[in-house]
Structure formats: C-alpha cells, structure tokens
C-alpha cells in the first residue's frame, strides 16, 4: 500500500511537469491521469486524493518492510489540526527521550518557522538538531504527496547526528490529512477536546488510521462541555479498537504512555532494545 503511494508520487510528477491541457502558469489543471493537480508557492504540484470513507485502523498502510534505518532513522510523524498540541508533544517527547537516545526534529509551518523556534527557545534539543520547513499553503502535501521537502532535512539530520529517532511535526491541517508511510514509520495524530466531543466520530485518515490517537487537553473538557466517555466510545469504534491516549501534554499527563507506544514500535521495527 505504502509503496503504491510512492509509485503514484513519481507517476504524478511525470505528468505534472508537462502541465497538460495548456495548464502552464495556471494554479490548477487536469493531468493525463484525469486527476486535478495544483501547486502553491512553487511547491511541486500534487492532487487531492478523494476520500470516500472515514477510514479503518485495521486497513491502514503498514510500515514499510524494506526500510533502511541507517539511511534515515526511525521516524515518528506527529499530525493534527492547528492548536491541538503538536509542538507541545514534540517538546515533551524530546525531554523524555533525549538523555538516552540521539534525537533530531523537523517542524512544518505554513508561512513561518514558529514551531521550530518554539522548540529551540524551550531547549527541546540543541538548535542544530532542529530544522524548520515552510510548506506554503498546502501543508498536507509536504507529509503525503510531496514528501521530499521533509525527507531531505530528516536524512541529513539522521546522518549528521547518528540519530536513533527522528520526530517530524506536520503543519496544522484538517482532519483529512495524514502522513505517507514513505515518511513516517510511526504516526501519532493529536486532537483536543476544545472542539467538543464530536471530533473522534467525524473520522478522517488521521483519526482512524494513525498508529496512535492522542486526545489532548482533557482538563478543558468540563469548560467546553465535552464528555470524555463519549470520546472514548467513539475513538474505540472509529479506530476498530486501535490505541488512543487521553493526555494533558502541557502538564506531562499521558506522555509516558505515548512514549511507551512509540518505543514499542521502535523496538519492533529496528530490532533494538530500549535503554
């Protein structure tokens, strides 16, 4: 499944550069494969894949079997809508793991380098281990259709620091965005309760197919009238029983459980043992 995505990635771009049907200079055009392509701010063109269902955890794309971790370390992708706590989770994971493992991080922002600067300012990792990428207007493309903007910095950091683990934070996007398996070996999708308890049942690839769903800011539940038991029920149903964690990342609650999920997968993928 994941390798299928990858072939499409190259296939799409063969057509993109031709900009068929007189599409030169247009913001969007129809490729020879019938898909509508568009590009933003000079980023490589990409299409928006149609989504016909909320997705299924059991049918999610499996991690790649032929991954060479000496080329790029085990990569954790952290996605989710704007303001849910992605950068706070990046910081928490760095603090939890940095003393035992060699880490590096790449952040994606649409037009700024704010998230990367936040990690530097808060001492998540030494500054040289953090890269901030500006994705332009379509942040989902940088984690799915046009991942080269992230692969480059990740591979460079991995080799430079002999990394054990890489963290990649997506730009804030909608519920339909999710990481390509070509980029992320383990996918965390983070939502929060401030939008109400209906979010898990809305579904979308992030909620249903991420390896781990994190429901953050549970301390706000009472204030916004969100029922955590409803969120738990809907998360179990939407994710076919796939794992999720209630958390207050800013206060450290749930972080160790998240780390345990990540490191279990890291052990399984790399054959190494936790320190």
Swiss-Prot record:
The keyword Transcription regulation does not apply. Required for the maturation and activation of urease via the functional incorporation of the urease nickel metallocenter. InterPro entries: CobW/HypB/UreG_nucleotide-bd (IPR003495), P-loop_NTPase (IPR027417), UreG (IPR004400). URED, UREF and UREG may form a complex that acts as a GTP-hydrolysis-dependent molecular chaperone, activating the urease apoprotein. It comes from the Eukaryota. Belongs to the SIMIBI class G3E GTPase family. UreG subfamily. Disruption phenotype: No visible phenotype under normal growth conditions, but mutant plants cannot grow on medium with urea as the sole source of nitrogen. The keyword Ribosomal protein does not apply. GTP binds at residues 80-87. GO terms for molecular function: GTP binding; GTPase activity; nickel cation binding. NCBIfam families: ureG (TIGR00101). One of its GO terms (biological process) is urea catabolic process. Keywords: Chaperone, GTP-binding, Nickel insertion, Nucleotide-binding. Residues 1-12 have a biased composition (Basic residues). One of its GO terms (cellular component) is urease activator complex. Residues 13-24 have a biased composition (Basic and acidic residues). This is Urease accessory protein G. Residues 1-31 are annotated as: Disordered. HAMAP family: UreG.
